[in-house]
C-alpha cells in the first residue's frame, strides 16, 4: 500500500505545536484528518530521537494498525548540509522504532525514510548503505527480523528536478537488487525560494510529465509525492480556494503533503473539501508538456528572479527576524538557504519564514516574477506558460488581495512596484488589499501583527 496523504510537521500555521505535542498530533492525523502517513521531521528541526518509538507505542496502545494501514516516515537531515551525527541518529531512531513495532505488532511502522535536498548521487548512496548496515546490525544482535526502510529522494531544486531521471537511475545502480517501485518526492517551497514561483512550478509540471517515459526506460514504477503548502508560492495545493485548480495543474501525483496550516488555520469542513479534492485527483496520468521551450523559460525566469531578490535581501532578512516560529525548528540563520546572483551569495530564511516575510512587506512572493511575466507578455510567450500552468492567473488574482503598492514600495522600491502593477494590468487583475487586511498591512510590524495577517490569510507562510 502506498499512502495518499502525508501529514507533516511544517511550521506554516499560526498555531504553535511543540515537539512534545507532536506524538498526540500524529494519532489525530490518522484518526481525525484521515492521513495514512505522518512525516516526522528532523531536517533543521530539534525533534526528539525518541519520537518515532513514542508514536509507535502510542499507536499500538490505541489499536491503530501502524505499518499496515498507517505509516510513519521520518525526514532525516541531509548529511551533506547538516551535522553528520544528526543524520545517523535519525536513521538509528527509525530502525529502533521498527524494532519495537515488530516486537509489539509483528510489522514495521517505518517503511520509508525521506532524504531532503537531494542534488547528488553520492549522498543517496551513502544513506542507502548506512540504512543497510544499521539494519543488519540490529538483526544480528537482536534476532528480530527487520527490513531496511526504503529511501525516498526529496528533490527541492528546479534544476535538479529536471534531472530527476539521472538521480533515480543513479540510486538504482547503488542497490543490490532492483526494487518494484520508487517514491519520488518533489518539493515546491525550497525550489521557489531559490528560483521563484514561475520556474519552480514549471519544473515540477515538466518533471511529472517526464515520469511516464522514465518509468519505461528504467523499468520501474514511480510514485510521485508533491511537497506543497497553502500559499501559491509553496504550491497552493492545501489552499481551500485553490486546491481544485492545483490538483489539475500538478496532475500525475500519487501522494500529497497535508501541512499544518490547512489543518489548524482553516475550518474542519474546509479541510475535508481540500482532502477530498486531493484524493479525487490522485493517480491520474500527467499532462503532455513541451519540455524544450519550457526549460528555456525556467532558466530565464530563475535568473531574473534571483537578480530581484538580491536587491532586497537586507529587507527580507530584517522582516524574517520578526516571523514567529510555530515548531521547534533550528533558526534559519543556522540552517537557511543560499541564493547566488550577480556574484553575490545571500543567506535567506527557509521557505515558510521567507514566504511570510514577503507577505508582511505587502508583496506576495509570486509577484517577484513580474519582470519575467512582462517580458513574456511582450514577446507573445505568456500563453505558452499559461497553458503549462493553467492555475497561474488565478494564483496571481488570489495573491492580489494581499498586495498593497504603498506598503510594497516602502519595503522594496517604487520602480519594482511599477513593474508589478504593469504585470497585473497585462493580466487584467484589479484586485488589491482592502478592509481589515489593508489596515493590518499598514500597521507597525511586530509578531502579533504578523500572526494576525497570517490568521486572515489562513496560513503563516
Swiss-Prot record:
It catalyses: oxaloacetate + phosphate = phosphoenolpyruvate + hydrogencarbonate. Its EC number is 4.1.1.31. One of its GO terms (biological process) is carbon fixation. Pfam families: PEPcase_2. Keywords: Carbon dioxide fixation, Lyase, Magnesium. Its cofactor is Mg(2+). The keyword Methyltransferase does not apply. InterPro entries: PEP_COase_arc-type, Pyrv/PenolPyrv_kinase-like_dom. Homotetramer. NCBIfam families: PEPCase_arch. This is Phosphoenolpyruvate carboxylase. It comes from Pyrobaculum islandicum (strain DSM 4184 / JCM 9189 / GEO3). The gene is ppcA.
Amino acid at each position: 500500500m502506498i499512502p495518499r496523504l502525508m501529514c507533516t510537521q511544517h511550521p506554516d500555521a499560526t498555531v504553535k505545536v511543540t515537539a512534545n505535542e507532536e506524538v498526540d498530533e500524529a494519532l489525530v492525523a490518522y484518526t481525525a484528518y484521515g492521513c495514512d502517513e505522518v512525516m516526522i521531521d528532523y531536517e533543521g528541526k530539534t525533534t526528539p530521537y525518541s519520537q518515532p518509538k513514542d508514536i509507535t507505542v502510542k499507536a499500538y496502545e490505541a489499536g491503530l494498525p501502524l505499518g499496515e494501514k498507517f505509516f510513519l516516515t521520518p525526514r532525516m537531515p541531509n548529511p551533506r548540509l547538516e551535522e553528520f551525527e544528526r543524520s545517523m541518529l535519525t536513521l538509528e531512531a527509525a530502525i529502533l522504532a521498527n524494532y519495537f513495532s515488530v516486537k509489539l505488532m509483528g510489522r514495521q511502522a517505518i517503511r520509508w525514510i525521506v532524504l531532503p535536498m537531494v542534488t547528488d548521487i553520492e549522498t543517496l548512496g551513502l544513506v542507502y548503505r548506512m540504512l543497510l548496515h544499521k539494519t543488519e546490525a540490529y538483526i544480528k544482535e537482536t534476532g528480530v527480523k527487520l527490513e531496511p526502510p526504503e529511501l525516498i529522494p526529496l528533490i527541492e531544486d528546479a534544476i535538479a528536478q529536471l534531472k530527476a531521471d539521472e538521480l533515480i537511475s543513479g540510486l538504482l545502480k547503488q542497490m543490490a537488487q532492483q526494487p518494484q517501485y520508487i517514491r519520488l518526492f518533489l518539493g515546491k517551497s525550497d525550489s521557489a525560494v531559490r528560483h521563484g514561483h514561475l520556474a519552480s512550478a514549471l519544473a515540477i509540471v515538466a518533471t511529472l510529465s517526464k515520469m511516464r517515459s522514465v518509468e519505461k526506460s528504467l523499468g520501474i514504477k514511480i510514485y510521485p509525492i508533491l511537497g506543497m503548502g497553502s500559499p501559491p508560492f509553496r504550491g497552493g495545493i492545501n489552499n481551500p480556494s485553490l486546491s481544485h485548480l492545483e490538483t489539475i495543474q500538478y496532475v500525475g501525483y500519487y501522494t500529497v503533503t497535508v501541512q499544518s496550516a490547512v489543518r489548524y488555520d482553516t475550518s474542519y469542513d474546509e479541510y475535508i473539501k481540500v482532502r477530498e479534492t486531493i484524493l479525487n485527483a490522485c493517480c491520474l496520468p500527467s499532462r503532455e508538456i513541451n519540455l524544450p521551450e519550457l526549460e528555456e523559460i525556467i532558466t530565464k525566469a530563475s535568473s531574473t528572479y534571483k537578480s530581484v531578490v538580491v536587491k532586497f535581501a537586507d529587507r527580507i532578512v530584517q522582516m524574517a527576524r520578526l516571523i514567529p516560529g510555530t515548531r521547534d525548528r533550528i533558526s534559519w540563520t543556522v540552517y537557511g538557504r543560499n541564493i547566488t546572483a550577480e556574484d553575490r551569495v545571500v543567506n535567506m530564511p527557509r521557505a515558510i519564514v521567507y514566504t511570510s516575510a514577503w507577505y508582511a512587506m505587502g508583496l506576495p512572493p509570486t509577484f517577484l516574477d513580474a519582470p519575467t511575466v512582462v517580458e513574456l507578455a511582450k514577446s507573445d510567450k505568456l500563453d505558452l506558460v499559461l497553458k503549462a500552468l493553467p492555475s497561474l492567473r488565478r494564483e496571481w488574482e488570489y495573491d492580489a488581495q494581499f498586495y498593497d503598492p504603498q506598503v510594497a514600495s516602502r519595503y522594496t522600491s517604487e520602480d519594482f512596484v511599477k513593474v508589478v502593477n504593469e504585470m497585473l494590468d497585462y493580466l487584467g487583475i484589479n484586485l488589491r488589499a482592502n478592509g481589515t487586511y489593508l489596515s493590518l498591512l499598514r500597521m507597525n510590524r511586530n509578531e502579533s501583527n504578523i500572526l494576525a495577517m497570517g490568521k486572515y490569510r489562513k496560513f503563516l507562510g
